[in-house]
């Protein structure tokens, strides 16, 4: 797809904005990757809930990537059992995703293993309902907030990672 100047946040944002505009309502997942050299790639497996990276020849270590979550598949956050573990495995520096309602970002996960993530996630699961109650969220909104809070709380337990979510 091209190459960008890694020191130009404006250039990266222009690619990202075009990507969001083009794939915001797609029925399949698509991912835009900017590797550590600035090479830009577009990936899809034509699947609604994942991108198969098996035969992909891109160095993800140190990369920035963003992918869409089709409306029928969104959890209003990253999937804690696929997106985050893949990030930990491949060394992605910054991972973003978006759905029809939110955009989310996870970074600074260097040094966290999948085993540590699974343990923190397990502990965090026990806290989701009480955190929702503490924040005054209605349990009828569980689907919209559960994964968001789970990832946020897992990062807090690990003392690693910066996770944010904002409305589009």
Where is each model-derived feature located?
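Short beta-strand scaffold segments in enzyme catalytic cores
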Residues: 28-36, 95-98
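Structured interaction and signal-relay segments at domain junctions
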Residues: 41-51
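Short Pro/Gly-enriched beta-strand edge/turn motifs at strand-loop
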Residues: 11-18
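Low-complexity, glycine/serine/proline-rich disordered segments
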Residues: 1-10
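Active-site-proximal loop/helix of nucleotide/amide-processing enzymes and allied scaffolds
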Residues: 1-2, 50-168
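Short glycine-rich, polar/acidic loop-and-turn segments at beta strand-coil junctions
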Residues: 35-37, 46-47, 69
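A short catalytic or substrate-binding loop motif that flags glycine-/basic-rich loops and adjacent residues
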Residues: 23-27
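Short secondary-structure junctions
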Residues: 40-41, 164
């Amino acid at each position: 797809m091209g190459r960008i100047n890694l020191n130009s946040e404006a250039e990266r944002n222009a690619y990202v904005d075009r990507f969001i505009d083009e794939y915001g309502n797609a029925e399949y997942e698509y991912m835009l990757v900017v590797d550590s050299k600035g090479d830009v790639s577009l990936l899809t497996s034509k699947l609604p809930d994942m991108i198969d990276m098996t035969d992909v020849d891109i160095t993800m270590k140190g990369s920035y990537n963003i992918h869409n979550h089709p409306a029928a598949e969104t959890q209003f956050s990253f999937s804690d059992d696929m997106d985050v573990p893949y990030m930990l495995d491949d060394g992605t520096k910054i991972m973003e995703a978006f759905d029809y309602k939110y955009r989310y970002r996870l970074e600074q996960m260097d040094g966290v293993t999948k085993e540590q993530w699974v343990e923190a996630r397990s502990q965090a699961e026990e806290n989701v309902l009480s955190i929702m109650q503490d924040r005054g969220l209605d349990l009828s909104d569980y689907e919209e907030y559960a994964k968001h809070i789970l990832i946020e709380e897992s990062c807090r337990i690990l003392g690693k990672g910066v996770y944010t979510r904002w409305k589009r």
